[in-house]
Amino acid sequence: MRIYSAKLKNFRGYHEETQIDFNDLTVIVGKNDIGKSTILEALDIFFNDGKGCIKPDNEDLNFDARIGGEDTFSISVEFSDLPKEIVIDSDACTTLESEYLLNINKRLEIKKTYSENGKLKATYIVAEHPSNENCSNLLTNKITDLRKILQNFNIECDNKATSNIIRKSIWNYFSKDLKLKTCDIPVDKEDAKKIWSGIYKILPTFVLFQSDRQNKDGDAEVQDPLKEATKRILRNEELQKELEDISEKVRTELKKVADATVNKLKRIDPAIANILKPEIPESTDLKWAEVFKSVSITGDEIPINKRGSGVRRLILLSFFMAEADRKNSDRGDNNDIIYGFEEPETSQHSDNQRILITAFKEISKDRNKQVILTTHSGDILMQLDFENIIMLSGDKKKKITSIEPDQLCYKSLNEIDYIAFDNPTSAYHDELYSHLESKELIGGYLNTIRQKDYIEKNKYTGEPMPVRKIGLSKYIRHQIHYSDNEYNEHYTNQELRESIDLMRKYISKEKSN
């Protein structure tokens, strides 16, 4: 299963319902505090019910929603690549489609609502479902109620012992009058709990790697995988027998020492000696795992917390992925895994950033893996296809847009920086201007934009030349390349942005002609 999309409503900065679409590899970009991490944390809450990195609380309800009298927020996730069959009633196999549990796009959509204090309020499946009152609540009905419907309408059914077969018979009977419509089907009450239990088993495992962590070898995330590995190793039957033999040998030797001590004491104070006896724990009472409580990974005898921050983060990130695989394996259902990485470039040299994104791209190609990350790194974005990048913008009204190949005929870091991070730079201005020159479009373009007074510096005398009008973009271009000319006011950031936008629009117009 893959996350196809997610919807947030009344959650933190997301007041109006906002939909985010995902690919096998999705990179979310945008300004600081725009809500990128909120998307990852919403997924953590949805999948892990507060038992992952994020615990929902009363500050998660959107401020405007609270002021407006609303007291719930919702997180919805839409899944694609669904299993062909699913078990939701005892051991009987059925399909999500035949149970009318798919939305209008033939995908599985699950919505969870939370109260203002952050507690899970209800779980729904949003689906195109029968609304005919005679067959609209079959999923929540007990099997005895389903049999009554068979009886009341004289509906034939081959197997009255299996709920999903009874439901299918009833829906077939009303097939010409199902009145399908999109509705929220509650799956956390009545017999629908069985349905949710079956669906929950096939959901992907989601794990979140956050950026703000200390990355020490004493951290719980580092210690836990090794501690769990220690416990699993020590549970091995053969090893248990060896430990018991060791324990018995130690007990025997300790008893000799203790008995000799008591015998000596009898010669000094028999009364005290007679009430003393050695207390030596049994092998089963020994906490063998505690012997290995300080396990860690070192290199050249240097522990993680003495390494550089970049290396610490790489090691911890590797722990994180190994732990995610282990947790998924422990579920026993061979589920898909979704990795969420928050700003993986933190503390990493640009070379390491490129190595990381290459690794993420390879991971996302695995049949059962999906990768979602946030970034501020142009180096990472340069390694991606445009289809992998989505941009988050807007303040109170969030806007999600994809980044498309744009005005230049090659992938430009400066252009990506401008589109993704809204960062106008003189370098990008230079690229656009040079592109217009190379296409012999610069003359026509400069005649279409506003003109600005410019004083040229005489290259021989250094004296100012007469004032003349030139296009805004040429004015900025001259200031970039002739910075020693002090006779003109420096262009403003607003003018730089204006000029970039004008050149982009002109290039786009010429492309379409």
Question: What are the language-model segments listed below?
Answer:
Residues 41-104:
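Conserved P-loop NTP-binding catalytic core
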Residues 70-75, 106-108, 118, 202-206, ...:
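Short glycine-/polar-rich loops that comprise or flank the Walker A/P-loop
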Residues 186-192, 198-207, 211-339, 471-475:
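Extended helical coiled-coil dimerization/tether regions that scaffold
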